[in-house]
Amino acid sequence: MKYKIEKNTVQETLILPLYSRKLCTELYPNLYRDETAVHLIDQIDYDFSQAEKNSRSLMQRFGALEVAMRQNDLAWEVRAYLKTHPCAAVINLGCGLDNTGRACDNGRCKIYNLDFPDVIALRQQLLPAGEREQNIPCLFRESGHCKLYLCLCARGTIKPKGVLPGPSSVTELPFFSFIEKP
C-alpha cells in the first residue's frame, strides 16, 4: 500500500529531507547510507518528478548532501552521548520521517519521536514505534508543558497519550534533546 502525501500540506514538508537522504544514498554510497529513506520513498504516493528533475542540479545535490551530513552529525552526537549515558532518553523533536533515534539505539535508551499530529499519524503507518520507542503527536505550543511532559515521560512517571502541548516556536527547540533517566 502506498501512502498519499498531498501538495501544500504539513506532511509535504517531510518530502525534501527524505528525498535528500535517498538521493545521497544513491549518489554517495561510500559517504552516506539511509536504506530507510530509500524504502520509505517507495511507500509514498507523491509526484517526485520535480524533485527528480531538480536532483540533476549541483545546488540540489549540495543541499541534499547538507541534509545527509546533518543526519550524520546528529547521529554521531547521539551515539557519543549514549556512550556515557546509556539509559538516557533521546528526544527527537520535529522527527518527521527521520530514523536517527532508532539508528542510534544502544539497546538501553528510550526514544521519543515528536511532531505534529498529522505527521505522527503518517509516521505511525510508515515507521511504527519500536520496543523502547514512542511516536508522540505534539502541538508545540506551550514550552513549559512540553518540558514537564518530556521529563515525566523520560522518568517513566507517565505514558504519552493523545496530543502533547509544546513550545510557541518550533525554531526555539533543538532537533534532539537528552534527558538523563534517574
Short names for language-model regions:
Residues L150-P182:
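A short SAM/SAH-binding and catalytic strip from SAM-dependent methyltransferases
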Residues M1-I91, C95-C138, S143-G144, L152:
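Rossmann-like AdoMet
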